[in-house]
From Swiss-Prot:
Active site: C182
Enzyme class, first EC level, given as a word: transferase
One Pfam family named in its UniProt record: LplA-B_cat
Native species: Thiobacillus denitrificans (strain ATCC 25259 / T1)
Record-given protein name: Octanoyltransferase
Length: 218
């Protein structure tokens, strides 16, 4: 990309009354995961959906389909087996994580449709700054020139989701070299900074919140 770095789009939408947005800052992984589980277990038909925006300290998470052989190098970063779909991924500072706590029964669509909508939110956000992003058949997430910029993994219980997506903004990508990201040997990863997008975590959280709200509730 040439010239000045694009400014992150600031297109605000009216808050959906059935959505509570929480910006949690940098929080440890395991307590946040347990809080998601508790929220999903305790919510009722009238409970508002929630969107949690946050960062995690360095951690690998291993999904239900995960195999430890996809951790291919020794590391001091903890590995946490969890209950989302998918394989192994990395979370760390400078990555915006959006946990999507949505009642799909109220929305009237299923988990595959939600995954497509979450992917489209990231694709649209990048397109607004002239970055072309795509999906990849059989490998949920968002890619730029074949490199993964956003990972997705969800769990559904009683029609309600938790977990969500992780969007690489301005982070140390080196820990990805110790794993086969999402179980794919040799998969490249990228981030906004490397695409010439000098976005802060705070700016990205605001813009991603709006993009996700449009995608989920349209």
């Amino acid at each position: 990309m040439n010239g000045a770095a694009p400014i992150i789009p600031d297109v605000r939408v009216e808050p959906d009354p059935s959505l509570v947005v929480r910006q949690l800052g940098r929080v440890a992984y395991e307590p946040t995961w347990r809080a998601m589980q508790a929220f999903a277990a305790q919510r009722s038909a009238g409970t508002a959906d929630e969107l949690w925006l946050l960062e995690h300290p360095p951690v690998y998470t291993l999904g239900q389909a995960g195999k430890r052989e996809h951790l291919i190098a020794a590391t001091d970063i903890p590995v946490v087996p969890i209950d989302r779909g998918g394989q192994i991924t990395y979370h760390g500072p400078g990555q915006v994580v959006a946990y999507v706590l949505v009642d799909l029964r109220r929305r009237g669509y299923g988990i595959r449709e939600l995954v497509a909508r979450l992917e489209q939110a990231v694709i649209d956000l990048l397109a607004a700054s002239n970055v072309e992003a795509t999906r990849r058949a059989g490998a949920p997430g968002v890619y730029v020139d074949g490199a993964k910029i956003a990972a997705l993994g969800l769990r559904v219980k009683h029609g309600c989701t938790y977990h969500g997506l992780a969007f690489n903004v301005d982070m140390d990508l080196e820990p990805f070299a110790a794993i086969n990201p999402c179980g794919y040997p040799g998969m490249a990863v990228t981030q906004c900074r490397d695409l010439g997008l000098n976005w802060s975590v705070e700016q990205t959280e605001r813009a991603l919140t709006d993009a996700l709200q449009r995608a989920i509730y349209s």
